[in-house]
């Protein structure tokens, strides 16, 4: 038996504090900071959008960020087993979070394959999205980057920009709908394979390899962002774009959709409620100051989003001025910004290949560490569930390889002609804000009331030697669950079915599939709790008490040790007094 146990590998720790900080920064600072936050800010009231954004930062983002990093550092466990040790009744939250991460791993890397294809295309003598002389172009194609081009509104309505045709007809080979899956796009498939190979070798040795890779993947995007920011601010029309980005519209604050979008952006941008932060913090040493780390990482995340907006809208302002049209007509979000609007703007600049290469390197690196850290979170959580089987020499590498192959085969359909429609289903339903909001409600309720916010405060104080601000206790017990519940209900009330390009309506079976993906994670939370209650032994009250009790093997805080000594001393004194009386 001793010989078998001796073969189990140590879980390990980060090589340095910098590795942890860079890994978390690389995970939480991703594509959403560049292509989602700036667009939301302009669309929902400019500078006024920062008010609901900051409200959600204070009530949900930072409190949950601190809570999850503290949970991981205290238990030294992954996203599932940490719940088993803190509150077995809530273990379904861990399973649900890992399922959402699994869905994310399956579709998020497709974006990186598109970006890699654009990066390779950027090395051509003429950018392929900057001309209408290619085999994929139609008679309606118009090259907006052409010099001395005279445009009017009628021309724009009746034509298709070259960048749009490159995206839809060359990269996606877009079919007529999800019913028409069509052929495999072999070039995108090869790019996808390349990205999976890179991600595999980034995490195959665990934190030993991840901790070294993030020194590059988490820092170099900032170099690219700075370069693009300086270039954008020096373009004509940049000021117009920035004013459009931040001009406040206070009236929009009365629109519930503005608050919903702000809440969803915070939850995704901060990567809370899905277990990623718990896993990353679990590789810290017990006495790391996770309280200070969490505050600074949250500040870095939000500041990056704000600065990225200047880089994006300065370029969109330039493009609008060059075309002589309002910025609202060129502003895009998501893939539309990264693969149509920005490449189109780059094509209008001097040295377009240089700026295209810089932009797509930044996009790839921003998404890369988000992808491989999510993979690390899932694999670590599963390995912590089965340490006797998976934590043996050579088995981690095999398990990660099988995980990559499973995700790759599952996403194969996304690189077909109808793949973008499946991609949108995953993005809109499987990983949507409502699922994460649902988890955040129960996470804060369980840790605030069942495990105990006061106990969590003692744990953080014991680990960091500093007691958190009292506002965090108020958030965990009241504000975070209240805000999350209201946002979840509103998101259900305000639900609108998914469409593609504002014209394609999915068939009913596709919507049913989307809801199945969304509910697959949500039902795990109550389903696990009810299953454990029914499967347990004893009375219902005994089962409830057992499932709400933390693992007695968890580390004791200084306060708990002092209380135990006092209890032991009191008991010994009582025994001594009783013995003397006898």
Residues covered by each model-derived region:
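Membrane-interface "cap" regions at the ends of multi-pass membrane proteins
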Residues: 1-35, 64-69, 79, 83, ...
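Membrane-embedded translocation segments of transport machinery
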Residues: 1-16, 207, 211-375, 379-412, ...
């Amino acid at each position: 038996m001793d010989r078998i146990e001796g073969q189990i590998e140590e879980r390990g720790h980060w090589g340095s504090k910098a590795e942890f900080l860079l890994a978390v920064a690389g995970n939480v600072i991703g594509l959403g900071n560049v292509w989602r936050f700036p667009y939301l800010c302009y669309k929902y009231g400019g500078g006024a959008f920062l008010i609901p954004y900051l409200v959600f930062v204070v009530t949900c983002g930072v409190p949950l960020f601190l809570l999850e990093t503290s949970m991981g550092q205290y238990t030294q466990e992954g996203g599932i087993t940490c719940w088993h040790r803190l509150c077995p009744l809530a273990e379904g939250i861990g399973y649900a979070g890992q399922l959402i991460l699994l869905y994310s791993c399956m579709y998020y890397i497709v974006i990186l394959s598109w970006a890699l294809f654009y990066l390779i295309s950027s090395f051509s003598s003429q950018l392929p999205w900057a001309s209408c002389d290619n085999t994929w172009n139609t008679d309606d194609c118009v090259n907006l980057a052409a010099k001395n081009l005279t445009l009017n509104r009628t021309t724009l309505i009746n034509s298709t920009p070259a960048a749009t045709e490159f995206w839809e007809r060359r990269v996606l080979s877009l079919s007529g709908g999800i019913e028409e899956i069509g052929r495999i796009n072999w070039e995108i498939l090869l790019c996808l394979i390349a990205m999976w190979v890179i991600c595999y070798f980034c995490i195959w040795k665990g934190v030993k390899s991840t901790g070294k890779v993030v020194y590059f993947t988490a820092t170099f995007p900032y170099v690219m962002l700075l370069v693009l920011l300086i270039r954008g601010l020096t373009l004509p029309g940049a000021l117009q774009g920035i004013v459009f980005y931040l001009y406040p519209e206070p009236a929009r604050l009365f629109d519930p959709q503005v608050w919903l979008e702000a809440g969803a952006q915070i939850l995704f941008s901060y990567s809370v409620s899905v277990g990623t932060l718990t896993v990353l913090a679990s590789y810290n040493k017990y006495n790391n100051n996770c309280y200070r780390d969490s505050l600074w990482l949250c500040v870095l995340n939000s500041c990056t989003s704000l600065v990225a907006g200047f880089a994006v809208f300065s370029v969109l302002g330039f493009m609008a001025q060059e075309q002589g049209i309002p910025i609202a007509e060129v502003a895009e979000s998501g893939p539309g910004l990264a693969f149509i609007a920005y490449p189109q703007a780059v094509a209008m600049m001097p040295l377009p290949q240089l700026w295209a290469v810089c932009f797509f390197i930044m996009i790839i690196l921003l998404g890369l560490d988000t992808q491989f850290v999510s993979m690390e979170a899932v694999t670590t959580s599963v390995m912590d569930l089965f340490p006797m089987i998976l934590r043996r020499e050579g088995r981690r590498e095999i398990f990660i390889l099988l995980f990559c192959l499973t995700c790759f085969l599952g996403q194969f359909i996304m690189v077909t002609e109808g793949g973008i429609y499946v991609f949108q289903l995953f993005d809109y339903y499987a990983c949507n804000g409502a699922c994460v909001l649902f988890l955040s409600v129960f996470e804060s309720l369980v840790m605030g009331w069942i495990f105990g916010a006061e106990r969590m405060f003692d744990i953080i104080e014991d680990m960091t030697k500093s007691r958190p601000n009292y506002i965090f206790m108020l958030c965990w017990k009241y504000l975070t669950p209240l805000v999350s519940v209201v946002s979840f209900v509103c998101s259900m009330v305000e639900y609108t079915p998914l469409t593609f390009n504002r014209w394609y309506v999915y068939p009913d079976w596709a919507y049913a599939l989307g809801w199945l993906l969304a509910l697959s994670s949500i039902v795990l939370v109550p389903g696990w709790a009810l299953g454990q209650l029914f499967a347990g032994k004893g009375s219902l009250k005994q089962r409830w008490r057992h499932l709400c009790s933390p693992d007695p093997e968890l580390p004791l805080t200084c306060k708990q040790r002092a209380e135990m000594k006092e209890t032991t001393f009191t008991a010994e004194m009582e025994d001594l007094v009783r013995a003397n009386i006898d």
